Amino acid sequence: ALCVLKKGWLATAVYGGFFGAVATTDYLKYSMTGDYFYPWDLAEQAGHLGELKNFITVPFPVLYIAMILFVFVMAVIVFFSGAQLPIRWCFRYPALAVVVVCMAVSVSTPEKVTRLLNKNALYLEDMALQTSNYQANGFVGAFTINILSSNIQKPDNYSEDAVDALLDGYTEQDKSDDFSSPDIILVLSESFWDPTLLPGTTFSADPLENYREIASRENTISGRFFTTGLGGGTVRPEFEVLTGLSTDYLPSGCVPWQYILEDTDSYVSVYKGLGYKTMAVHPYTSSFYNRKAAYPKIGIDELHFDDDIYALGEELELTIRGRQISDDTFSSTIEYYLDKNSDSPVFLFGISMENHQPYPDKFETPDIEVKNDAFDESTANAVTNFTTGVSDADKCLKRLIDYIDNRDRDTILVWFGDHLPTLGGNMAAYRQSGMIGAEYDEESYEKIYSTPFIVYANFDLGDSDLLHKGTDNNITSYNLMNGVAELIGSPRTPYMEYLEDYARALPYYNIRLHKTITDDQRKWVDGHRLLTYDRVAGGKYSMK
């Protein structure tokens, strides 16, 4: 900083201010979501800072206010001392260029990165489990490691032959004779989760009344959906549900869509190949999570974001609830685009927005009273408002079910929650209610990394090896649409066949579940990692 700015006080202010801001951001993010601040957060959120400030739900720490004052005082002291670098720019800038080139060369290969980090007592950790990275290396060290390790780590055994060996024996499965080309509605419901699972908590009404009634019907499939998100990170399960790939071995906290730079096979592309109209509906900005750029590359042709929904205006009876486009408007939008495209089968992926955090004081008048004597005031506020939001989502689900039942065209709805909600800083509601303790075991991880899902159709679904009628299903994000494909008899690729066998060996798995697995099961996990690398960063041999 001093080499560029010359003046000591300015370098002090810029350098101290930057790292102070980064440290504060890390504190706020971890307090709200239990996840750390990553380098790619800077790139992804740079254009949304004005919106993001509305998501802050924890008090600004006094310690960080003191740190800001300290940086200011130091800058003033240096200013009056007159300290500066007494070298002209024509010497400073070339020297800086030499330093930059040397740094670039020293991290130009993965081997050099590892060697450089180890010399400074910093060690590469499992990129999917950043807790160990931050605990071992501290914030600055872990942040540096993440900057230098933003590329996906290549599996040691990756090659075209290795990919072929994994998929050897699997063949393309054509559609079944009874495949009716049904419309497919796939809904990611923001933070859809059952708050009645919080021990000792009472509710004046059941927030998931409709979900439970629909799940009890004879032709319905429901259960637990295992996700890689917690309190945020919608994009991870979203990516896995649409592609069948895993985010376990991508840099933790990254935006998976940033790696989809060319056409990539997905569950969506299977239906596009059958002549389906493919579209996405999301009542939020199109630039978030790089969706606008990535969706067409996995086969989604029509993109409808908040600007399209606002443009439809009165035609949808647009309403705002909880500071977002309401779930009622969201369901109206889905119905609108399905009715508009009734001349051909449709695959529609929708992401709701109404029940997005922050929850404190989200709704003017919460619909359901919530009580738990263990909750402090702020936690009770968050849980109460979340409960109103998830009740609205439950009504949205019922509306779509009624819509499907009144259609002549075969239609299937696949509905799931992306992650548990943030209910107070540091998992407050879950800890205060006793749902989780200070130490986690496998059961605890299953609780916090699973949400409800439901599959419903206006035609007989039957059963499959991955999904069956009833409420006791367990499915992973990357296998959900694989199971649906088998239910309706749509074509299945060799990769989808591989994932089904993976589920036979290990019914549900992601690295965040901390499951103890056998050596044989580990082979399937490693195979999934290799195939994911192949499609997002490798030669795409599995698509040939």
How would you describe each model-predicted region?
Residues V107-L186:
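Membrane-interface segments at or immediately adjacent to transmembrane helices
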Residues A46, A136-A142, E160, L208, ...:
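Alpha-helix initiation and N-capping motif
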Residues T171-P182, L186-S189, D194-K544:
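Solvent-exposed soluble domains appended to multi-pass membrane proteins
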Residues A1-Q130:
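Transmembrane and membrane-interface helices of multi-pass
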Residues M32, W40, L129-F139, T228-G232:
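Membrane-interface micro-motifs in multi-pass membrane enzymes
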Residues I56-P59, D168-T171, I260:
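N-terminal post-signal-peptidase region of extra-cytosolic proteins
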Residues C3, L28, I56-L63, A75-F79, ...:
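Short secondary-structure junctions and interdomain/linker hinges
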